[in-house]
Amino acid sequence: MYSLDWPRAYGIPNSTATFKSLPEDFQVNELFEGQFNGEGEHIVLKIEKRGLTTEEVVKSLARLINKPVKLISHAGLKDKQALTTQWLSVHAPGEIIDGIETLEAPGWRILECTRHNKKLKPGFLSGNHFIITLRNVSDESDLIHRIEQIKFKGVPNYFGEQRFGRDGGNLIKAEEILVQGRKVKDRFLKGMYFSAARSWLYNLILSRRVKESSWNLPLLGDVIQLVGSNSIFVNDKSMDEQLLQRIGEKDVSPASPLPGRSKNLVKGTALQIINDVYEEWSAWLDGLEKNGLEEAWRANILYAEQIEYRINQGTVELSFVLPAGAYATVVLRELVQY
């Protein structure tokens, strides 16, 4: 029912490759715009983890320092099958936790320790730096061509498979809540299922634009989003040359909705595409609105910045930076089959 094989912008890649044969083949490092101020109520820890989820590390850390899990915060979840660094904050006002800066356990260790006056939460991150190793690459020339292509044109900004849980499990739970009226007391789980549902509907809308080759074009009535910002405006022209130029300069992007209570911003051709999806999934839309979700917008185009690659006898090491909330796998799927 929930196929996660979304249409590609540049067709199915010629090249195949092996990905994640080792956790070190997928490395992720968090990026922050500012610096931690070195003082405040929160101990801030830079963690390196391998083969563990963020939640598993948080629970392990909580046991070692004898603190409730609810006092430990993060700015984003990181993949399990990867080697990642991320920051965690521990609410410990006026408290010194002896030896915390050298703590380690199977699968994780602390690299740095400081303090900050605010706890970490989603929104703190400016982005993530990825280092990805692809092995047994069958067509290096096709891969290089595609890398050069996405440098300038970007890729569809789909939510990655991780968003939807194993085998789309989060979507099944969302269906039970939104359509069947199942009650879920755990606010975190409920929010995760709602996020999966909204992401699914966003991907459906974006996928239709990819099929029509309009995902990166400003349609009449489109919501346009400034790249790197939540600022939006509505395009009131059928094909605006100035907007096309700004899209080419990576200044703005057409955007698609994360459904909720609507402000009725969209008009024209763009509205028809959205309505087609909403009519098919009206029960989900009604459920999201009844649960108080507000409509939000997400850019259609994802730009991978600072792209570099090295090739050595069928192995390609690829590095790039993505904004917070973007998925490296949606870049990879435009480059190779894995």
Curated annotation (Swiss-Prot):
Pfam families: TruD. It is an enzyme of class 5 (isomerase). The active site is at 79 (nucleophile). Residues 154-303 form the TRUD domain. GO terms for biological process: tRNA pseudouridine synthesis. One of its GO terms (molecular function) is tRNA pseudouridine(13) synthase activity. Its EC number is 5.4.99.27. The keyword Iron does not apply. Keywords: Isomerase, tRNA processing. Belongs to the pseudouridine synthase TruD family. PANTHER family: TRNA PSEUDOURIDINE SYNTHASE D (PTHR47811:SF1). This is tRNA pseudouridine synthase D. It comes from Legionella pneumophila (strain Corby). The lineage of its organism: Bacteria, Pseudomonadati, Pseudomonadota, Gammaproteobacteria, Legionellales.
